[in-house]
Swiss-Prot record:
Disulfide bonds join C60-C66. Has antimicrobial activity against Gram-negative bacterium E.coli ATCC 8739 (MIC=50 ug), against Gram positive bacteria S.aureus ATCC 6538 (MIC=3.1 ug), methicillin-resistant S.aureus ATCC 43300 (MIC=12.5 ug), B.subtilis ATCC 6633 (MIC=12.5 ug) and against fungus C.albicans ATCC 90028 (MIC=50 ug). InterPro entries: Frog_antimicrobial_propeptide (IPR004275), Nigrocin (IPR032749). Residues 1-22 form the signal peptide. One of its GO terms (cellular component) is extracellular region. One of its GO terms (biological process) is defense response to fungus. This is Nigrocin-2ISb. It is found in: Secreted. Belongs to the frog skin active peptide (FSAP) family. Brevinin subfamily. Residues 23-43 form a propeptide. Its main location: secreted. Expressed by the skin glands. Pfam families: Antimicrobial22, FSAP_sig_propep.
Length: 66
């Protein structure tokens, strides 16, 4: 009976460690995705800002109202 309890305790302990490692890996993956999304948003903002400035310059040049 005692060896059965030790075996069950060992399995529980190893399972807990395994779940902990999986959670850490999942969190790291989410952080990588968040960083990638933030970079893409920053690139989009930069491109849109440039397009709006260029459009404003074109409208200003064509109409002469600056």
């Amino acid at each position: 009976m005692f060896t059965l309890k030790k075996s069950m305790l060992l399995l529980f302990f190893l399972g807990t460690i395994n779940l902990s490692l999986c959670q850490e890996e999942r969190d790291a993956e989410e952080e990588r995705r968040d960083e990638d999304n933030a970079k893409m948003e920053e690139i989009k903002r930069g491109i849109l800002g440039t397009v709006f400035k260029a459009g404003k310059g074109i409208v200003c040049g064509l109409t002469g109202l600056c």
